[in-house]
Amino acid sequence: MNHLVLGYVGLVIGVIVTKKSMVWRVGQVGSVLLMLPATVLVNMNMTISNVSYMMTSDFVSLGLTVLSIWLLPLMLLASQQHMVSESLIYQRVFVGCQVFLTGALVLAFMASDLLLFYIAFESTLLPTLMLITRWGAQKERYQAGTYFMFFTLVGSLPLLICLIGQYQMVGSLALDLSYEGVFQLSYLVNFWWVGCILAFLVKLPLYGVHLWLPKAHVEAPIAGSMVLAGVLLKLGGYGMMRVSLMWGATAMLSSEVFLALALWGIVVMGGICLRQTDLKSLIAYSSVGHMALVVGGVLTGVAWGYNGAMVLMIAHGLVSSCLFCLANLWYERSSTRNLSGSRGLIMIFPLISLGWFLMSLMNMALPPAINLFGELVAMVALYNWSPYSIVYMSLGAVLTAAYSLYLFGMSQWGNTMKNYKNLYTITSREYLLTTLHLVPAIYLIFYLGLMF
């Protein structure tokens, strides 16, 4: 496990010292070499007994670790086209940021101590901020970076305070210990619980603290959007699962408020998506709705809820990352993300429209998509918590189907604008990029046992 993190450190150094013509090749080849042993871990029986002094891997962290490693070569593949014109130093920094960010994510998912997890959690802030503010497309990227930094830091400070307090009371921050019953006063439990999960709710994000996400997605380059939607949001869900498993029922006393916000967020985000005219903005808001169901699954505190949330996070990471790639594919050719100006793509790029079609179906959790299994399991857990929640979940499912069909129909059907008929064709790099998102999403349909 430690060798995997050291591999990313070596890859960052390799990107810095290699000659200009080899920067992207070193990054891509190195990330693929690190990806190969990670995929072998999927077939291993990783339990909580596989714990070293610093690193661990179990059913909670393994899937997200492999997802992070899988997406790195795809981010480099998606970014290569628009980074060719940059100077050598900026290319090195760009590739180095992505490699460092992936290494920090792997360290966060495999940390066996809450302090190490917090350090890795915060280490993702700077490279993500650099990707947004330096390589964003418009001047609003600075505002997006400010929002992202403000929400992240404000949410993370209570977490640090709570971790310090926990260490003073218990003398340990190990993830494999149970801390249930440590607090004797109920108000201290509520205070600690809210302080701990606030950082994770901001990172997910939960409806109400989600304002940074659409801005960051819209202004970020394709690599930033992919890592945000694919993995960074999952840090919040992973952190909530870890904290909940450590403290058990003791830490669930104040979860009703957040569960209510999550259910309301599913409905509201579905309605907002139907009003969007920007491709990236629509996909970003849909992420908030899907992550709200993850919050609901985790905060129910039952095993089914955890399993559903885990499947949802992995499925959403692949689907949303691919949707952002497809949106960027069109943006690089037309310089627009407006839905009304993106009509008739099926007439221009018929094969890529198949990718749009499959990902739209997965986004709405149509059978037999892996998203369906995650959503059903999470919904069962929420229904057991409160039968009234089925009203919000049903309405959210209808709205999700509506905006997914709206996204596909508005972008693929209709009359193509005349100035878009002579666009350059899809390259093999872009076909490969789309395929590498589709293959694991389809593979997991037939091997659900890997995640249950």
UniProtKB/Swiss-Prot annotation:
It is a multi-pass membrane protein. It comes from the Eukaryota. Keywords: Electron transport, Membrane, Mitochondrion, NAD, Respiratory chain, Translocase, Transmembrane, Transmembrane helix, Transport, Ubiquinone. Its EC number is 7.1.1.2. GO terms for cellular component: mitochondrial membrane. It catalyses: a ubiquinone + NADH + 5 H(+)(in) = a ubiquinol + NAD(+) + 4 H(+)(out). InterPro entries: NADH4_N, NADH_UbQ_OxRdtase, ND/Mrp_TM. It is found in: Mitochondrion membrane. GO terms for molecular function: NADH dehydrogenase (ubiquinone) activity; ubiquinone binding. One of its GO terms (biological process) is electron transport coupled proton transport. It holds the Pfam family Proton_antipo_M. Core subunit of the mitochondrial membrane respiratory chain NADH dehydrogenase (Complex I) that is believed to belong to the minimal assembly required for catalysis. Complex I functions in the transfer of electrons from NADH to the respiratory chain. The immediate electron acceptor for the enzyme is believed to be ubiquinone. Belongs to the complex I subunit 4 family. This is NADH-ubiquinone oxidoreductase chain 4.
